[in-house]
């Protein structure tokens, strides 16, 4: 399932956590899991929780934990909240919530009424089986000109700025950028091997290749695309610029 596309798509079954620093615009994968339920019996939700627990063991303390609504299970939300961290995630429109003045009376997220003030500040709601969250409604214009209404929630109840909320949510798109670069630059989807171990090794090597390109790009102040293309470009310039380049002799 792709939260970006809003439908099931064909892709690599990899779940990963990405660290992003908005001050330097650096983004790096800190952990990943290959989804293979038949092999280990774990769902993508299980992998997400395992990686979050491992990140805490490694003393990661991010300002925000961002993820798609597909992973917004009560179990993961509670893990993040108990770790005293702030999450911000998209919420499905059929999730049940209760208003401040109507506690115990639940309704779907998309059935809530919104005043002009609440459009800017969000509104406090009680998420069933979890607790208080601040909910924002954001209308996005899609490339085809249509509009899509999205709902996002956070446990940072003091956040009352839609502009700030959209800025924070924008950080989440770095995961899409990472996957796009991984696919376009490393051939992670083009493994020809049939053995499971070989396929896993291919994915691991592809991620390592991206890391090498990223390190070179940051060191030279260029993009990862240029970091891959430049060595070949420099070589071709050198060879084509040499008048004494080797030529096959004509047969006598």
Predicted regions and their residues:
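Active-site-proximal, Lys/Arg-enriched surface segment
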Residues: 1-24
């Amino acid at each position: 399932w792709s939260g970006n596309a809003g439908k099931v798509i064909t892709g690599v079954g990899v779940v990963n956590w990405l660290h992003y620093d908005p001050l330097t615009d650096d983004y790096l994968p800190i952990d990943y899991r290959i989804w293979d339920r038949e092999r280990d019996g774990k769902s993508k939700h299980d992998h997400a929780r395992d990686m979050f627990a491992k990140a805490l063991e490694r003393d990661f303390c991010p300002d925000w934990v961002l993820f798609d609504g597909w992973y917004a299970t009560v179990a993961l939300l509670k893990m993040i909240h108990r770790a005293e961290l702030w999450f911000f995630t998209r919420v499905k429109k059929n999730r049940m919530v209760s208003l401040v003045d109507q506690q115990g009376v639940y309704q779907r997220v998309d059935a809530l009424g919104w005043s002009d003030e609440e459009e800017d500040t969000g509104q406090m709601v009680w998420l069933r089986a979890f607790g208080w969250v601040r909910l924002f409604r954001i209308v996005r214009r899609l490339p085809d000109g249509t509009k899509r209404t999205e709902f996002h929630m956070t446990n940072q109840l003091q956040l009352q700025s839609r502009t700030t909320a959209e800025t924070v949510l924008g950080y989440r798109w770095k995961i899409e950028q990472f996957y796009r670069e991984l696919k376009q630059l490393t051939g992670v989807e083009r493994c020809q091997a049939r053995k499971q171990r070989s396929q896993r090794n291919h994915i691991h090597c592809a991620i390592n290749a991206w890391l090498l390109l990223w390190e070179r790009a940051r060191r030279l102040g260029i993009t990862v695309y240029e970091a891959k293309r430049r060595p070949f470009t420099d070589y071709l310039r050198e060879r084509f610029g040499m008048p004494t380049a080797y030529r096959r002799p004509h047969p006598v």
